[in-house]
């Protein structure tokens, strides 16, 4: 297995769709040149209960969310997480979850570049 020289981490952010725009508009501050965003259905420990509901749900109710996936150098993760937490925080149920996992390597298939080279802006030729 090929391993990247620089340690990389994957940050997966699950949140409301309305909060994703702020994340994407400001990601470049952290040198992020790419991300993956997809729609998801899910719920947390509240089982999909909304704050305006008087009683907690007894069964799972899946809510519409978006997942933002970013890979960046591990040394930059703490600053990025501070930004993400401040961007998402409302203090209400459903602000989201963040998962951080190590990434062994990243490979740009077209060029064979690996590690951070695979994540940086490349040439178009």
Per-region residue spans from a language model:
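Positively charged, small/polar-rich N-terminal and surface patches that mediate targeting and assembly
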Residues: 1-125
């Amino acid at each position: 297995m090929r391993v990247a020289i620089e340690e990389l981490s994957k940050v997966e952010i699950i949140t409301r769709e309305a909060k994703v725009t702020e994340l994407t508009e400001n990601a470049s501050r952290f040198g992020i040149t790419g991300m993956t965003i997809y729609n998801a259905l899910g719920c947390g420990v509240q089982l999909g209960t909304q704050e305006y509901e008087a009683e907690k749900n007894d069964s799972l109710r899946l809510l519409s969310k978006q997942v933002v996936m970013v890979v960046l150098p591990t040394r930059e993760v703490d600053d990025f997480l501070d930004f993400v937490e401040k961007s998402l925080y409302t203090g209400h149920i459903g602000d989201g979850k963040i998962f951080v996992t190590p990434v062994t390597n990243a490979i740009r298939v077209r060029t064979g570049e690996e590690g951070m080279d695979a994540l940086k802006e490349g040439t178009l030729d």
